């Protein structure tokens, strides 16, 4: 029983992390664009 509980918690954590990584992927190009546009000015 304990093993399955740990597995469920691990699954939840990895899913949340994957969503964060996906969100980060969308934000990263914007962040770099913003950073470089500020440097060129």
UniProtKB/Swiss-Prot annotation:
One GO CC term on file: extracellular region
Source superkingdom: Bacteria
Main location: secreted
Pfam families, per database record: ComC
Keywords: Competence, Pheromone, Secreted
GO molecular function: pheromone activity
Residue ranges the record assigns to the propeptide: 1-24
Signal sequence bounds: none
Family, similarity comment: Belongs to the ComC family.
NCBIfam families attached to this UniProt entry: bacteriocin_sig, ComC_Streptocco
Annotated protein name in UniProt: Competence-stimulating peptide
Originating species: Streptococcus oralis
